[in-house]
Amino acid sequence: MKGTSGTPLSDNRKTGPMANVYRTVGVTCPSTCPLLERGCYAKRWPVALHAKRAQEKTLDFNAFLQEVRKKNPSKIVRLNVSGDVFVNDEVDREFMDELIAAAKANPDILIYGYTHGFEKVHAAGYTPDTFPANLTLLASVDDKDTAAKAAAYGWKYARVERDYTAKTDEDEVFCPIDAAKSKGIEPKTTCAECKLCFAEKYKNVNIVFQYVTGGRKKKGGA
């Protein structure tokens, strides 16, 4: 995977122990991403540092998963902490094919990420029903209309909401970490413990994240 780097074990208060995969911002992002030129968190430190380093890196994803298995007790991989699944505004088939093959070869490792270009990914033939059970790619959407379209295509989605008390659809759950922070209390879980975004048992549950003043969360930003 060109323009891609990985950290087999990273740990912070929100995510808990996870492996992170970084891609170059811009060239791997869809031109339709509304945050690309205004507020993309991946252009801010410290994520920007990893994204810049990824420019010169090539990641062997299967070998990376072997390293994750050895070093990461959670065996959870978060894709696209920076960047997306594109190259020059087209679906990066080399990336997707290697990702899917590696996921199938390592069913004990949970892999998840978000894309701002689910329609192009879907049109390219990479639909949710073609992903193995341990791989979840969520549609990152910016409004309820796009969320409805993603759901109609069979995609699990993540969207943002300004108010954690706002009414959500029956198949939506507010991120418990964001909800706790909105109430001014310490979250009682981490992403690694929660698993709402990626565990197979939650495959029909869509996620709502908190709108952040000065810029929206992107892809469930940590």
Please place each PLM-identified region on the residue numbering:
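Class I S-adenosyl-L-methionine
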Residues: 1-222
